[in-house]
From Swiss-Prot:
<comment type="function">
    <text>RNaseP catalyzes the removal of the 5'-leader sequence from pre-tRNA to produce the mature 5'-terminus. It can also cleave other RNA substrates such as 4.5S RNA. The protein component plays an auxiliary but essential role in vivo by binding to the 5'-leader sequence and broadening the substrate specificity of the ribozyme.</text>
</comment>
<dbReference type="Pfam" id="PF00825">
    <property type="entry name" value="Ribonuclease_P"/>
</dbReference>
<dbReference type="InterPro" id="IPR014721">
    <property type="entry name" value="Ribsml_uS5_D2-typ_fold_subgr"/>
</dbReference>
<keyword id="KW-0694">RNA-binding</keyword>
<keyword id="KW-0540">Nuclease</keyword>
<keyword id="KW-0255">Endonuclease</keyword>
<dbReference type="InterPro" id="IPR000100">
    <property type="entry name" value="RNase_P"/>
</dbReference>
<dbReference type="InterPro" id="IPR020539">
    <property type="entry name" value="RNase_P_CS"/>
</dbReference>
<dbReference type="GO" id="GO:0001682">
    <property type="term" value="P:tRNA 5'-leader removal"/>
</dbReference>
<dbReference type="GO" id="GO:0000049">
    <property type="term" value="F:tRNA binding"/>
</dbReference>
<dbReference type="GO" id="GO:0004526">
    <property type="term" value="F:ribonuclease P activity"/>
</dbReference>
<dbReference type="InterPro" id="IPR020568">
    <property type="entry name" value="Ribosomal_Su5_D2-typ_SF"/>
</dbReference>
<dbReference type="GO" id="GO:0030677">
    <property type="term" value="C:ribonuclease P complex"/>
</dbReference>
<comment type="similarity">
    <text>Belongs to the RnpA family.</text>
</comment>
<protein>
    <recommendedName>
        <fullName>Ribonuclease P protein component</fullName>
        <ecNumber>3.1.26.5</ecNumber>
    </recommendedName>
</protein>
<keyword id="KW-0819">tRNA processing</keyword>
<dbReference type="GO" id="GO:0042781">
    <property type="term" value="F:3'-tRNA processing endoribonuclease activity"/>
</dbReference>
C-alpha cells in the first residue's frame, strides 16, 4: 500500500473509532468510516503487544496489508478502514487471514463485486 493510503496519525484513528461503524469476528475488528470525496481507500492497522513479540505483530500487519491489496478492487474506495488484530490472528496463514478479513468485510457490507470496475494504480 502506498503512503497516502495509510492512516498514521492518532487523530485520524480516533475519528474512525468515534464516527465509524465496527464489525468483528474472532480474529479481527474492522472499523469503517465513509468519507465524502475520497477517491482511494485508506488503511490503519493496530496489533497490540498482547498478541506477540515484534516479529509476530509485524507478520500479522504484512499479511493484513497483502490481503487488503488483493481485495482492494472489491472494497468501497471512499472509506477509511482500521483493522485491529486479536490474539487468535497470530497463528493464521495468509489464506486464513484473507478469509477472515473477507468474512468481517461482508458483515460490514463493504465488500462487493460492484466496486471492482475501478482501475488500480501500479
Amino acid at each position: 500500500m502506498k503512503k497516502e493510503q495509510r492512516i498514521k496519525k492518532n487523530r485520524e484513528f480516533s475519528a474512525v473509532f468515534k464516527k465509524g461503524s465496527s464489525m468483528a469476528n474472532r480474529q479481527f475488528v474492522l472499523y469503517v468510516l465513509p468519507k465524502e470525496g475520497q477517491d482511494r481507500l485508506r488503511l490503519g492497522l493496530s496489533v497490540s503487544k498482547r498478541v506477540g513479540n515484534a516479529v509476530c505483530r509485524n507478520r500479522i500487519k504484512r499479511l493484513v496489508r497483502a490481503a487488503f491489496h488483493e481485495l482492494e478492487g472489491q472494497l468501497r474506495p471512499d472509506c477509511d478502514y482500521v483493522v485491529i488484530a486479536r490474539n487468535p490472528a497470530r497463528d493464521l496463514s495468509f489464506k486464513e487471514v484473507r478469509s477472515s478479513l473477507e468474512h468481517v468485510m461482508k458483515k460490514a457490507k463493504v465488500l462487493a463485486p460492484l466496486y471492482g470496475n475501478r482501475k488500480k494504480d501500479s
